[in-house]
Protein backbone atom coordinates (compact mmCIF):
# COMPACT_ATOMS: atom_id res chain seq x y z
CA UNK A 1 0.00 0.00 0.00
CA UNK A 2 1.19 3.51 -0.85
CA UNK A 3 -0.36 6.54 0.86
CA UNK A 4 0.40 10.14 -0.06
CA UNK A 5 -0.97 13.30 1.52
CA UNK A 6 -1.15 15.91 -1.23
CA UNK A 7 -0.95 19.45 0.21
CA UNK A 8 -3.41 22.17 -0.72
CA UNK A 9 -2.75 23.55 -4.23
CA UNK A 10 -0.20 20.80 -5.02
CA UNK A 11 0.06 18.26 -7.83
CA UNK A 12 0.47 14.48 -7.68
CA UNK A 13 0.94 11.65 -10.15
CA UNK A 14 1.33 7.89 -10.08
CA UNK A 15 1.23 4.83 -12.25
CA UNK A 16 -1.59 2.61 -10.98
CA UNK A 17 -1.18 -0.96 -12.17
CA UNK A 18 -4.01 -3.08 -13.58
CA UNK A 19 -6.04 -4.50 -10.70
CA UNK A 20 -4.86 -1.94 -8.15
CA UNK A 21 -7.26 0.48 -6.50
CA UNK A 22 -6.72 4.22 -6.08
CA UNK A 23 -8.67 5.74 -3.20
CA UNK A 24 -8.96 9.52 -2.90
CA UNK A 25 -9.85 10.87 0.55
CA UNK A 26 -11.20 14.39 1.03
CA UNK A 27 -9.50 14.97 4.38
CA UNK A 28 -11.17 18.24 5.36
CA UNK A 29 -14.25 18.32 3.11
CA UNK A 30 -15.34 20.39 0.10
CA UNK A 31 -12.04 20.03 -1.81
CA UNK A 32 -12.11 19.61 -5.59
CA UNK A 33 -9.57 17.19 -7.06
CA UNK A 34 -8.91 17.66 -10.78
CA UNK A 35 -7.82 14.44 -12.49
CA UNK A 36 -6.50 13.15 -15.83
CA UNK A 37 -5.89 9.49 -16.74
CA UNK A 38 -3.63 8.05 -19.46
CA UNK A 39 -2.61 4.58 -20.59
CA UNK A 40 0.74 4.20 -18.82
CA UNK A 41 2.33 2.56 -21.87
CA UNK A 42 0.82 4.80 -24.56
CA UNK A 43 -0.21 8.25 -23.35
CA UNK A 44 -1.92 9.00 -26.68
CA UNK A 45 -4.66 6.80 -25.20
CA UNK A 46 -6.25 8.97 -22.51
CA UNK A 47 -9.46 9.67 -20.62
CA UNK A 48 -12.24 10.88 -22.89
CA UNK A 49 -15.11 12.83 -21.36
CA UNK A 50 -17.31 12.48 -24.49
CA UNK A 51 -16.85 8.69 -24.67
CA UNK A 52 -17.45 8.28 -20.93
CA UNK A 53 -20.53 10.52 -20.83
CA UNK A 54 -22.06 8.95 -23.94
CA UNK A 55 -21.51 5.39 -22.75
CA UNK A 56 -23.14 5.89 -19.35
CA UNK A 57 -25.83 8.30 -20.54
CA UNK A 58 -25.08 10.98 -17.95
CA UNK A 59 -22.55 13.64 -17.00
CA UNK A 60 -21.96 12.68 -13.37
CA UNK A 61 -19.62 9.93 -12.14
CA UNK A 62 -20.38 7.60 -9.24
CA UNK A 63 -20.12 3.91 -8.27
CA UNK A 64 -20.14 1.80 -11.42
CA UNK A 65 -18.99 4.54 -13.78
CA UNK A 66 -16.29 3.41 -16.22
CA UNK A 67 -13.70 5.96 -17.32
CA UNK A 68 -13.32 5.34 -21.05
CA UNK A 69 -10.44 6.36 -23.30
CA UNK A 70 -10.51 8.13 -26.65
CA UNK A 71 -10.39 4.60 -28.11
CA UNK A 72 -13.53 3.71 -26.12
CA UNK A 73 -11.59 1.26 -23.96
CA UNK A 74 -11.84 1.12 -20.14
CA UNK A 75 -9.13 2.84 -18.11
CA UNK A 76 -10.57 2.81 -14.58
CA UNK A 77 -13.86 1.93 -12.87
CA UNK A 78 -15.39 3.72 -9.88
CA UNK A 79 -15.85 0.85 -7.42
CA UNK A 80 -16.91 2.84 -4.33
CA UNK A 81 -18.18 6.38 -3.80
CA UNK A 82 -19.23 7.96 -0.51
CA UNK A 83 -20.18 11.30 -2.08
CA UNK A 84 -22.73 10.41 -4.74
CA UNK A 85 -21.67 12.30 -7.83
CA UNK A 86 -18.60 13.90 -9.39
CA UNK A 87 -18.19 16.40 -12.22
CA UNK A 88 -17.07 15.78 -15.82
CA UNK A 89 -17.86 19.13 -17.49
CA UNK A 90 -16.53 21.93 -15.24
CA UNK A 91 -12.99 21.77 -16.59
CA UNK A 92 -9.74 22.87 -14.95
CA UNK A 93 -9.09 26.39 -13.71
CA UNK A 94 -6.39 28.34 -15.56
CA UNK A 95 -4.91 31.81 -15.52
CA UNK A 96 -6.93 32.59 -18.65
CA UNK A 97 -10.29 31.42 -17.29
CA UNK A 98 -9.65 33.06 -13.92
CA UNK A 99 -9.00 36.46 -15.51
CA UNK A 100 -12.08 36.11 -17.72
CA UNK A 101 -14.37 35.17 -14.83
CA UNK A 102 -12.91 37.03 -11.88
CA UNK A 103 -10.73 39.86 -13.22
CA UNK A 104 -7.18 40.48 -14.36
CA UNK A 105 -5.95 40.78 -10.76
CA UNK A 106 -6.19 36.96 -10.53
CA UNK A 107 -3.54 36.40 -13.25
CA UNK A 108 -0.77 35.61 -10.77
CA UNK A 109 -2.85 33.02 -8.91
CA UNK A 110 -1.82 29.37 -9.21
CA UNK A 111 -4.22 27.20 -11.24
CA UNK A 112 -4.91 23.55 -12.06
CA UNK A 113 -3.57 23.86 -15.61
CA UNK A 114 -0.23 24.97 -14.11
CA UNK A 115 -0.23 21.85 -11.93
CA UNK A 116 -1.10 19.55 -14.84
CA UNK A 117 1.65 21.01 -17.02
CA UNK A 118 4.33 20.81 -14.32
CA UNK A 119 3.40 17.30 -13.18
CA UNK A 120 2.79 16.07 -16.71
CA UNK A 121 6.26 17.24 -17.74
CA UNK A 122 7.69 14.60 -15.37
CA UNK A 123 6.16 12.02 -17.71
CA UNK A 124 6.93 13.69 -21.04
CA UNK A 125 3.50 15.30 -21.40
CA UNK A 126 2.81 18.84 -22.61
CA UNK A 127 -0.03 21.23 -23.43
CA UNK A 128 -1.26 19.19 -26.36
CA UNK A 129 -1.78 16.23 -24.00
CA UNK A 130 -4.26 18.09 -21.77
CA UNK A 131 -7.88 17.05 -22.31
CA UNK A 132 -11.19 17.65 -20.53
CA UNK A 133 -10.64 16.45 -16.97
CA UNK A 134 -12.61 14.89 -14.13
CA UNK A 135 -13.33 16.96 -11.02
CA UNK A 136 -13.70 14.58 -8.08
CA UNK A 137 -15.88 16.05 -5.30
CA UNK A 138 -16.75 19.16 -7.36
CA UNK A 139 -20.44 20.10 -7.50
CA UNK A 140 -21.41 21.46 -10.93
CA UNK A 141 -25.20 21.33 -11.35
CA UNK A 142 -26.61 21.78 -14.86
CA UNK A 143 -29.87 23.68 -15.29
CA UNK A 144 -32.56 22.79 -17.83
CA UNK A 145 -31.33 25.57 -20.12
CA UNK A 146 -27.80 24.12 -20.07
CA UNK A 147 -26.38 26.69 -17.66
CA UNK A 148 -23.56 25.38 -15.45
CA UNK A 149 -22.95 26.45 -11.88
CA UNK A 150 -19.97 25.95 -9.57
CA UNK A 151 -21.51 25.76 -6.11
CA UNK A 152 -20.79 24.44 -2.62
CA UNK A 153 -19.47 20.90 -2.66
CA UNK A 154 -21.35 17.78 -1.56
CA UNK A 155 -18.40 16.23 0.24
CA UNK A 156 -17.52 16.17 3.93
CA UNK A 157 -14.32 15.42 5.88
CA UNK A 158 -13.10 11.87 5.35
CA UNK A 159 -15.32 10.92 2.42
CA UNK A 160 -13.70 8.76 -0.26
CA UNK A 161 -13.99 7.69 -3.88
CA UNK A 162 -12.19 4.55 -5.09
CA UNK A 163 -11.20 3.56 -8.62
CA UNK A 164 -9.92 0.22 -9.92
CA UNK A 165 -7.38 0.34 -12.75
CA UNK A 166 -8.50 -1.78 -15.71
CA UNK A 167 -5.03 -1.51 -17.27
CA UNK A 168 -1.77 0.15 -16.22
CA UNK A 169 -2.67 3.85 -16.05
CA UNK A 170 -0.89 7.10 -15.33
CA UNK A 171 -3.00 9.33 -13.09
CA UNK A 172 -2.33 13.07 -12.86
CA UNK A 173 -3.98 15.09 -10.10
CA UNK A 174 -4.21 18.78 -9.32
CA UNK A 175 -5.43 19.40 -5.79
CA UNK A 176 -7.37 22.42 -6.94
CA UNK A 177 -5.98 25.82 -5.81
CA UNK A 178 -9.08 27.82 -6.80
CA UNK A 179 -10.04 30.53 -4.28
CA UNK A 180 -12.46 32.59 -6.39
CA UNK A 181 -15.48 30.28 -6.26
CA UNK A 182 -16.90 27.84 -3.67
CA UNK A 183 -15.56 24.61 -5.24
CA UNK A 184 -13.01 24.45 -2.39
CA UNK A 185 -14.97 26.48 0.14
CA UNK A 186 -12.65 29.39 -0.79
CA UNK A 187 -9.89 27.65 1.21
CA UNK A 188 -8.04 24.78 -0.52
CA UNK A 189 -7.04 21.89 1.76
CA UNK A 190 -5.06 18.63 1.61
CA UNK A 191 -6.29 15.31 0.23
CA UNK A 192 -4.95 11.77 0.53
CA UNK A 193 -4.16 9.33 -2.28
CA UNK A 194 -3.91 5.62 -1.42
CA UNK A 195 -2.98 2.84 -3.84
CA UNK A 196 -3.77 -0.71 -2.75
CA UNK A 197 -3.54 -4.12 -4.39
CA UNK A 198 -0.89 -6.65 -5.33
CA UNK A 199 0.80 -6.50 -8.72
CA UNK A 200 3.97 -7.91 -10.24
CA UNK A 201 5.60 -4.53 -10.88
CA UNK A 202 6.16 -1.44 -8.77
CA UNK A 203 4.25 1.81 -9.16
CA UNK A 204 6.02 5.14 -9.55
CA UNK A 205 4.53 7.92 -7.47
CA UNK A 206 5.27 11.62 -7.18
CA UNK A 207 3.66 13.69 -4.48
CA UNK A 208 4.35 14.73 -0.90
CA UNK A 209 4.41 13.03 2.51
CA UNK A 210 4.42 9.55 0.98
CA UNK A 211 4.26 6.44 3.16
CA UNK A 212 5.13 3.20 1.33
CA UNK A 213 4.28 -0.25 2.66
CA UNK A 214 4.57 -2.17 -0.62
CA UNK A 215 6.73 -2.14 -3.73
CA UNK A 216 6.68 1.47 -4.91
CA UNK A 217 9.06 4.27 -5.79
CA UNK A 218 8.46 7.81 -4.57
CA UNK A 219 10.15 10.78 -6.21
CA UNK A 220 9.87 14.55 -6.06
CA UNK A 221 7.62 16.91 -4.19
CA UNK A 222 4.86 17.00 -6.76
CA UNK A 223 4.20 20.71 -6.41
CA UNK A 224 4.10 23.22 -9.22
Question: What residues fall within each predicted segment?
Answer:
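Acidic, Ser/Thr/Pro
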Residues: 1-207, 224
Amino acid sequence: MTTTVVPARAAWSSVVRAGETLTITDLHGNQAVDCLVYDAHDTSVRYSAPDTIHAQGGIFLTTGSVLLSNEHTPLMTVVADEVGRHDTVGGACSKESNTLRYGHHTWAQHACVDNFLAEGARHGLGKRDLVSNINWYMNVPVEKDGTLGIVDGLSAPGLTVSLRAERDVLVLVSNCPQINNPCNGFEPTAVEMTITGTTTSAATTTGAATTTTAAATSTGAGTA
